[in-house]
A protein has these predicted regions:
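Q-loop/switch helix immediately C-terminal to the Walker
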Residues: 91, 99-112
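Conserved catalytic motifs of ABC-family nucleotide-binding domains
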Residues: 162
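Conserved beta-strand-loop-alpha-helix hinge in the C-terminal portion
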Residues: 222-245
Length: 272
């Protein structure tokens, strides 16, 4: 699915500028990966790379290699990969097509441009809107939606494409914690049924801790750690947002002798 081996990208002519990497990532079909880091960590740059936007990055491969869904990491453009890779970003209104006058047409826009038969387009639209709880919005204009409604519709647009890789780049920023949990449970169901791999890019450990099997920590473009939750928690950069109680606990406990099970994290995040 995804294999990045020592991959480092940046500017060959300006080696002192921001670099991303070296990155070592292995993601299998159906797996969920959380990429955690603060502002400026390189999360969105990595998201664009994974989505297939290499040609828009204007960067160079400085070291290593990468394969994403069987393709070299530096091949093609975003639109060439849209049928199998979907990237949902933080600002939903910027992701609307701008040429549809209803939510139903917006969700149908992508599948229709794949040249699918009308019955298949309609099935995908119906399934995706039901999954994202936005059937009641079908006749609304996309630009009349609230922030939370718009994010659910953009997620429906992505799922209607039936992707093999779904990249969620702070895609729940306008949803409440409860609504975020609901949406992620729905996406988990889709992932289990389709084999779609999911990557969450977040500043917060919540909600990724509840849904992801693997975690990658980024700080100023550097990969600090990658592995299961208990393996990466001791390496969390200060700019990853935690509750004060959890951060204090991580500072005093010895990770070699005290594992951090998900039950412990759920207790800390019960306040959310």
């Amino acid at each position: 699915m995804i294999s990045l081996q020592g991959l480092t990208i940046g500017h060959t002519a300006h080696p002192d500028h921001f670099q991303l990497g070296p990155l070592d990532i292995e993601l299998k079909e159906g797996e969920w990966l959380a990429i955690l880091g603060g502002n400026g960590a390189g999360k969105s740059l990595l998201a664009q790379l994974l989505a297939g936007g290499w040609s828009q990055l204007h960067l160079d491969t400085l070291a290593g290699e990468g394969v994403i869904l069987g393709q070299p990491h530096d091949s093609g453009q975003l639109n060439h990969h849209a049928a199998v890779r979907q990237w949902v970003q933080q600002s939903p209104y910027l992701q609307f097509s701008g040429c549809c006058f209803s939510v139903a047409d917006e969700v149908a826009f992508g599948p229709a441009n794949l040249g699918l038969l009308p019955d298949e387009v309609n099935r995908r639209v119906s399934d995706a809107m039901a999954l994202c709880h936005c059937k009641a919005l079908a006749a609304r204009h996309p630009l009349d939606l609230s922030g939370g409604e718009a994010q659910r519709v953009v997620l429906a647009c992505a799922l209607a494409m039936a992707p093999k890789l779904l990249i969620l780049d702070q895609a729940f920023s306008r949803l409440t914690p409860a609504a975020t949990q609901t949406m992620l449970r729905q996406i988990r169901r889709y992932s289990e049924e389709s084999g779609c791999s999911v990557i969450l890019l977040e500043q917060r450990l919540f909600p990724a801790a509840h849904f992801c099997e693997r975690f990658l920590l980024l700080d100023h473009g550097r990969q600090l750690a990658c592995g299961e939750l208990g393996e990466v928690l001791p390496h969390l950069p200060g700019r990853v947002i935690l509750t004060d109680s959890l951060r204090e606990t991580l500072q005093v406990r010895d990770p070699r002798h005290h594992p951090y099970p998900l039950a412990m994290l759920r207790e800390f995040y019960a306040e959310l």
